[in-house]
């Protein structure tokens, strides 16, 4: 039987349970009195009179600053970040007036697609800049209410938490003997969340009718995909500011149920694993998840959901870019291929920049990637370093107008050995991993 206690490392991962110590809340939106009410509870367990906070010019201005920092493409109205910035004061005044008068209506969401490793594409919804600002204001007002309830098993898109925290929790569970893992995949989660059930979750906490109506309008905003336009019957678009918060809210019930049953779940948005001590427990955990998903009108992907003992070869699981198998962490193939695609884009043979300029362009990307994947097994890194150097040697050969011929690789290596690139400041993961592995 699973243990009924929440893992100690998960408890510690919650930065603080006193909202008055939260540094990420907007003081102009959430006063000390409101934060204290989170702890003490509000009458009827629901929050009223939030609309004025959403419409407040200060809230909208703070939201605009966040939208401007994140950049992003224009929505269906064609208004870019730069164009909005040129007339920001006027646009914000109009937005305040429209919200207060009840005139604001969400525009259609422009759908685009971003490539995924393997040739698949992920749909992305791009709201207008104005809608991003209003959604950001809603998020600033609602997030503390939801965050107060969210459990330590959830790590994605939450203040002060992230993928590295989730991975540390997985490592701790594996070291504690939880080797049987349920690797679950929700099929099209962001596009399939039932609107009515999601709004029920919101209404269980919020009673401000205008806030609820605005949220509902955003969920039902038309989607424009090329020449096609339709009204969605479910889902919350990936790319919308408010979507991650709502997606976490809908899966909060799963966190609660699995924890109450004593299962060790680690969730990052819609990606989650359940770590168990034996196969029997894992099978029971999977049945529990399947039942919960059926009740909540969600679907587990049959081909991507499985159970295995991750100590065995071929029975590992993938989570947040890593593959856990045979007692080690490996870089997921898709993550490795995605990095190589980025390296190729920066090292095209017809690139006319100097070697110093190319290395200066490569290094921040390589350092950032290593910073995340440095806990992978050491054999992952030499092949990546070698791939980078081969790309650079091909550029140098072209700069010298040398033709490629049989045996060229060995000649290139002799002409430009590894030490040559080290002298030019190229970041190498093998060296960085060796340094990071030294005892301190």
Regions from the language model: what does each represent?
Residues 1-440:
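Non-catalytic terminal/accessory segments
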